[in-house]
């Protein structure tokens, strides 16, 4: 057999029955929870024109999108790498509501390259977005919802990191440096690359005040418990935007601390800096080097679709979460015989299935295959009455 007939691309995998069931049950539980919290389900397309996929998401998204040529129009299309911009487009352009809108989603996304050595290129993204409210109340609602969703998915020992892009932005906006240099600085901070940060700041001596350069180089050190905020207030310039951001972090932390095992502040966390506009957050758990859920405020993304709206949201990868869960045994079923025109048997099978039980009808020649069907029970007839009995596996 030709190996290429069954080989898959790197970092692309099939999902086999046991994991597929685990993922699907997790997806249902999380979506049900989002639904009772007032979040409406939307389903953006897997494929869009590249211009739409990249609108408002910054240049970094361009490297993550797999592109194909539309054979109908000749235009370049892309497979979505993140559903967040798509949902923002739906809110801004299609729903066009005046008040608050709560939306949720679940679906596969595709990355041109894996985001980490242990990550798939085809995550199953699930998340929620809240549009139309700019206060801390919506930030808290979304972050609380994220933590509750992780708990519902079965994740324990949650560590929450909180950051705020307004701290870095407040320092930079006072300098007048170019957007390209701003992105270089944000990249060095996000990567905690102190050497690169020092070199960049050294090149700013003539145009940036020494206190700001020192503050920029201090940001990677501002990671840890509530003492980080105390140090930041004393060491960073007391610009109103920075002080407001620190106050917001403190208030949110006081509300969320009871919901997590540990909580830390990271003032150099600039994940998604090209579109985030306020608080950012990431959840971690034991035995996983990657963030298991991420989110933040992104008030300007809708503007690219013709309607700027305050927005905050979170997303997580169900496939990654599934890998953290212990493998539950596959639910057992009930084996039923194949008997033509037995109305009592048909009625019993229908009743059991309506109750949520798995009933597998053994096709002719396979009556003794209870074990291969994962059945530990069987239907037996006594005096014309069908009932459940133990099956020998």
Curated annotation (Swiss-Prot):
A single Pfam family it belongs to is tRNA-synt_His
Organism, by scientific name, is Nitrosospira multiformis (strain ATCC 25196 / NCIMB 11849 / C 71)
Superkingdom in the source lineage: Bacteria
Hey, which pathway is this one from? Answer: Amino-acid biosynthesis; L-histidine biosynthesis; L-histidine from 5-phospho-alpha-D-ribose 1-diphosphate: step 1/9
How does the annotation summarize its subunit structure? Heteromultimer composed of HisG and HisZ subunits.
**KW S-adenosyl-L-methionine (keyword) present:** no
User: Where does this polypeptide localize?
Assistant: Cytoplasm
What is one GO cellular-component annotation here? cytoplasm
Q: Per the UniProt entry, what are the Gene Ontology biological process annotations, in alphabetical order?
A: L-histidine biosynthetic process
Question: Where is coiled-coil annotated?
Answer: none
Question: Which Gene3D superfamilies does UniProt cross-reference here?
Answer: Bira Bifunctional Protein, Domain 2
Report the main location listed first in the record: cytoplasm
What is the protein name stated in its UniProt record?
ATP phosphoribosyltransferase regulatory subunit
What functional role does this protein have? Required for the first step of histidine biosynthesis. May allow the feedback regulation of ATP phosphoribosyltransferase activity by histidine.
Miscellaneous field: This function is generally fulfilled by the C-terminal part of HisG, which is missing in some bacteria such as this one.
The record's family statement is: Belongs to the class-II aminoacyl-tRNA synthetase family. HisZ subfamily.
Kindly state which keywords UniProt assigns to this record, in alphabetical order. Amino-acid biosynthesis, Cytoplasm, Histidine biosynthesis
């Amino acid at each position: 057999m030709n190996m290429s007939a069954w080989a898959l691309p790197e970092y692309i995998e099939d999902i086999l029955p046991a994991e597929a069931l685990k993922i699907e049950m997790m997806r249902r539980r999380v979506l049900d929870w989002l639904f009772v919290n007032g979040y409406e389900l939307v389903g953006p397309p897997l494929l869009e024109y590249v211009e739409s996929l990249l609108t408002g998401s910054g240049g970094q998204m361009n490297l993550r999108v797999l592109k194909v040529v539309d054979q109908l129009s000749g235009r370049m299309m892309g497979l979505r790498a993140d559903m967040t911009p798509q949902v923002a487009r739906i809110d801004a352009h299609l729903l066009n509501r005046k008040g608050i809108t709560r939306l949720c989603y679940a679906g596969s996304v595709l990355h041109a390259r894996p985001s980490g050595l242990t990550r798939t290129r085809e995550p199953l993204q699930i998340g929620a977005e809240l549009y139309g409210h700019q206060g801390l109340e919506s930030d808290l609602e979304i972050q609380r919802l994220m933590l509750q969703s992780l708990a519902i998915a079965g994740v324990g020992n949650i560590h929450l990191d909180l950051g705020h892009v307004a701290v870095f932005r407040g320092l930079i906006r006072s300098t007048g440096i170019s957007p390209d240099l701003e992105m270089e600085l944000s990249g060095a901070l996000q990567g905690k690359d102190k050497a690169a940060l020092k070199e960049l700041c050294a090149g700013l001596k003539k145009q940036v005040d020494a206190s700001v350069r020192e503050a920029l180089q201090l940001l990677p050190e501002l990671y840890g418990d509530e003492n980080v905020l105390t140090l930041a207030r004393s060491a960073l310039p007391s610009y109103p935007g920075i002080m407001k951001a620190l106050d917001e972090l403190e208030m949110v932390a006081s509300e969320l601390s009871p919901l997590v095992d540990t909580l830390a502040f990271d003032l150099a966390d600039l994940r998604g800096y090209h579109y985030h506009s306020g608080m950012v957050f990431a959840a971690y758990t034991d035995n996983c080097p990657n963030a298991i859920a991420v989110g933040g405020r992104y008030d300007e993304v809708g503007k690219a679709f013709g309607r700027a709206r305050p927005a905050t949201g979170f997303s997580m990868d169900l496939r990654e979460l599934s890998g953290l869960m212990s493998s539950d045994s596959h639910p057992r079923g009930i084996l039923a015989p194949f008997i033509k025109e037995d109305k009592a048997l048909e009625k019993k099978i229908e009743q059991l299935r309506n109750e949520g039980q798995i009933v597998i009808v053994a096709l002719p020649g396979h009556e003794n295959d209870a074990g291969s069907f994962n059945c530990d029970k069987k239907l037996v007839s006594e005096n014309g009455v069908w009932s459940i009995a133990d099956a020998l596996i």
